Amino acid sequence: TTGDANVAIGGGALGANTTADYNVAVGQAALESNTTGAQNTAVGRAALISNTTASNNTAVGYASLTANTTGTLNTALGTAALAANTTASYNTAVGYGSLDTNTTGAFNTAVGYAALDANTTGATNVAVGAAALDSNTTGASNVGIGVNALGTNTTASNNTAVGHEALKLNTTGAQNAAFGTAALDANTTAANNAAFGYNALGANTTGYDNASFGSLALQTNTTGNSNTAIGKSALLANTTASNNTAIGSSSLVTNSTGAGNTAVGHVALLSNTTASNNTAVGLSALQTNTTGANNTSVGMNSLIANTTGGNNVAIGGSALTANTSASNNVAVGNDALAANTTGTQNTAVGTAALDGTDDGLGNSGVGYNVLSANCGNQNSGLGENALAQTTGGQNTAVGAAAGYQVTSGGNNLLLGTDAGRTGSPGGAITTGSNEIVLGDESISEAHIQVDWTVASDQRDKTDFTALDLGLDFVKALAPVTYKWDKR
């Protein structure tokens, strides 16, 4: 031959070489068929035995790259590594049987016993670990790092699995990412899932578009879709429910079939099982809720005791904190409606607003401490400390401290700052009912566009007493007419 700088050790090694240079063949029949292929290294019996014109291949191990003919720039280290490769290039196989059935798949990297073992035409795959991606045939652009990672994947592409048995059972599911031991290990055909953490999304089979970050997050999910779980054990018990978001350790941890829930904060919506469309933001928000639906809770301990109550809104620390089964309440402010348990259709806006109400119905309060002692029904208070001590019902007070001294009275109307307190017209109202008070003792004038009309009917009066005002009083009257001339 005319080839230069070749090394051949072993029977038949480089036996057919003609003009090729810089080849090294060590072992019986190593590079035996090579004619013009250059810069190849074959160490081991039958290594690169079929190579003819391909160059820059490295094969170390019995039967490594044994079927290669024209594939270039391949590296095979280990018995039977890349054994079936024929024309594919740019593959790296390290380990017994790694990439051993690959024929035309290119740009693959396999490190570990039987890594990418069944690959035939799949390209740009990376498998690191014993049996990683070992069932892959035509799947492309997969990354499997860890023993048995993506172990049963066949034709699926664009998956990433990092960790022992991550995505182990995946067959045709694509675009999944699993980081952590046993993450997404039961996934078969589902796509577009992301799992980060030990056993995250571990039971998922066909559920898609899920994101799980944290140990055991979404661990038991099987067919639920479009869930997001961030934090240890977040959405741990979820099985078939979809469209849930849980951010925080143990948030939504017992949810099984409830859908459309959002929980942000440690143990938020912790006990929720089947309820849907709840929003909980804050430490322990809606923590004990089980079947109550359509609640919104923002603030530490807000709606923390709620179990079955629905359609409640609590915004503020400890807002509606004692509520259990009541529905259709709105509480905005720290401790607003804090003592409410079964009262419904209440609205409280302001710190400590209606904070003493436990079973009241249809009350509305806006302002600091408004209606704070209330346990009655259908009261309305607007202003700081308005109706703050009342336990009666159907009172209306507008103004700071209006009706402040009303305790058990009902059906009163008090308008203006301090109306109904000591010093206001008629004195303080405490237990009185059916009274109207306008303003306090500082009011000096009262204006109205039209004349007052006050009902007067003898049938509604009693205890008549004669007056000593006779005809002389009547004669002294000087009636006039007038027109308004507003200043």
Task: For the regions a language model picked out, list residue spans one by one.
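Glycine- and small/polar-enriched repetitive beta-structure motifs of secreted/surface proteins
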Residues: 1-457
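C-terminal intramolecular chaperone/autoprocessing and neck/assembly modules of extracellular spikes
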Residues: 433-487
